[in-house]
Amino acid sequence: MKLNDLSPAPGSRREKHRPGRGIGSGLGKTGGRGHKGQTSRSGGTIAPGFEGGQQPLHRRLPKFGFVSLKAMDRAEVRLSELAKVEGDIVTVQTLKDANVINVNVQRVKIMLSGEVTRAVTIGKGIGATKGARSAIEAAGGKFEE
């Protein structure tokens, strides 16, 4: 037996629909599209959100909110995530290399969540909450100013 000899068991798979191939197929002539009208024509699809001429929902509701540009280049890091960084010095670049933060992030702040397992030196440009700072210093770590 070879791979080209293999075929599914008879009746285990349904035949694909072939519209417009005779009355007996059940999809002949109009091909399941019905008679006349926009959707019976080729290219006759209705745009997403179109509601037949009435004011669409996305235009009936008011605009709100915005996307903060600050949120795109800032990130919060938990104490427990510092363990993923190889080496003793934690910088923005080492956090990126360890896939802790996104490559677009420029400013980082460490939050008190989890535990510090080893002494680490936090590089310049990385902020920390009071609780996170005291936890890092209690574990023997320090901050570069």
From Swiss-Prot:
GO biological process: translation
Key words of the record: Ribonucleoprotein, Ribosomal protein, RNA-binding, rRNA-binding
Region feature (Disordered): 1-57
InterPro entries from the UniProt entry: Ribosomal_uL15, Ribosomal_uL15/eL18, Ribosomal_uL15/eL18_sf, Ribosomal_uL15_bac-type
Transmembrane segments: none
Source domain of life: Bacteria
Family, per entry: Belongs to the universal ribosomal protein uL15 family.
Molecular functions per Gene Ontology: rRNA binding; structural constituent of ribosome
Protein task: Binds to the 23S rRNA.
Protein's UniProt keywords contain Cell wall biogenesis/degradation: no
Subunit details: Part of the 50S ribosomal subunit.
Keyword Chloroplast: no
Annotated Gene Ontology cellular component terms: cytosolic large ribosomal subunit
Name of this protein: Large ribosomal subunit protein uL15
UniProt-listed Pfam families: Ribosomal_L27A
Native source organism of the sequence: Pseudomonas fluorescens (strain SBW25)
Gly residues bias locations: 21-31
NCBIfam families in alphabetical order: rplO_bact
